[in-house]
Swiss-Prot record:
Residues reported in the UniProt entry to bind Mg(2+): D13, G40
Reaction catalyzed: IMP + L-aspartate + GTP = N(6)-(1,2-dicarboxyethyl)-AMP + GDP + phosphate + 2 H(+)
This enzyme's EC code(s): 6.3.4.4
Provenance organism: Acetivibrio thermocellus (strain ATCC 27405 / DSM 1237 / JCM 9322 / NBRC 103400 / NCIMB 10682 / NRRL B-4536 / VPI 7372) (Clostridium thermocellum)
UniProt subcellular location: Cytoplasm
Cofactor descriptive note: Binds 1 Mg(2+) ion per subunit.
Protein name from the UniProt record: Adenylosuccinate synthetase
Assembly and binders: Homodimer.
Classification of source organism: Bacteria, Bacillati, Bacillota, Clostridia, Eubacteriales
Function statement: Plays an important role in the de novo pathway of purine nucleotide biosynthesis. Catalyzes the first committed step in the biosynthesis of AMP from IMP.
Swiss-Prot/TrEMBL GO biological process terms: 'de novo' AMP biosynthetic process; IMP metabolic process
Residues where GTP binds: 12-18, 40-42, 304, 330-332, 412-414
Enzyme class: ligase
GO cellular component: cytoplasm
Amino acid sequence: MATRVVVGTQWGDEGKGKYIDMLAKDSDMVVRFSGGNNAGHTIVANGVKYALHLIPSGILNEGKTCIIGNGVVVDPAVLLKEIKELNEKGISTDRLLISDRAHVIMPYHKLLDELQEKFRGENSIGTTKRGIGPCYSDKTERSGIRMCDLVDEDEFVRKVRENLKVKNLIIEKVYGGQKLDEEQVISEYLEYGRKLKEYVADVNSIIFEAIEQGKNILFEGAQATFLDLDFGTYPYVTSSNPVAGGVCTGAGVGPVFINEVYGVLKAYTSRVGAGPFPTEQNNEIGDRIRELGWEYGTTTGRPRRCGWLDLVMIKYAARVNGLTALAINHVDTIGKLPKIKLCVAYKKNGQETRNFPCSLKELAQCEPVYEEFDGWDEDISNVKSFDDLPDNAKKYLSRIEEIVGVKIKLIGVGKEREQTIVVN
């Protein structure tokens, strides 16, 4: 049995989907354990581009059981759209399952998300306005609606009527918005429930049964360490726990059953939306990285902020997630720059540190300490082994391993999943 977890080590968009898709080939089951459709995986397989926001990337591998775990919040309309688009491209969703414990994103969640962000004004946190945060808030408040409720029509109607009494008051009286039509919400969502009923199951039992049978299971992370509600750059974070520990609560799997944890990173750093970014290059270098790496959000289309790779962050991510391996992307991209910088420490009040601070005020006082490397402006897209990489690339990658203290096992040298070096 092998149970692997794949997590992002930065602010998301590291290219996790590519490695999840690759590792899924050796897995019997792929499980998504956190987040919602505010995250997106883009995979290019056999020349076809797939953008997935809820369904596990493993769906592209025939015969794999793909599970949306209880830690995920589900927008039924988005999920049904993804199912339809996959089916139209010849991809079967017969082996897709959704946890009966997963919470449902309702129209009032999306409306409140938008109204709250508008209310914050210049203090906005850059939410995607897809209702993720308000849905998780209801989950914590114990007023949420779960998939088991969505497919139980009487229970669903009761809960919606109860919730809308409060939600419509908040929408109207606090934010000055227009209240939602109760009957329209009920009618729309009952239809979603009927269409999704065949996919809803007690997936926790199914996962545990697979573990007992010695099956290979891949746990697919969305977003990343520095967007984690507890360990990220709070409050510029998501509303869930995308770190490896999120598997335990988001899929109902005890830590003793986790064998390997892969941390995915880019050879540089990017971020969407507001929040701190110590190595950001708000200049021609940042613009060049953005264009070379085509750094625009899968979900929002927003241009990403770009900068140098920050190993203080990666080392912190290695500790928080218990990483056993690194998987690095865009090695081909960063090498096109003549000079490359690598942040190996921070300097604060004249003192060097390799610890990532909790306080954003303290983080703002930290200056990156850089080491400089020469680029390798040559085509490496067909390189199949570490030894065949340019010397400058090998120096760069070896320094990353040395400082982080975790071996690089997968190296991305292009967009296709075949353009990956597996390091033994």
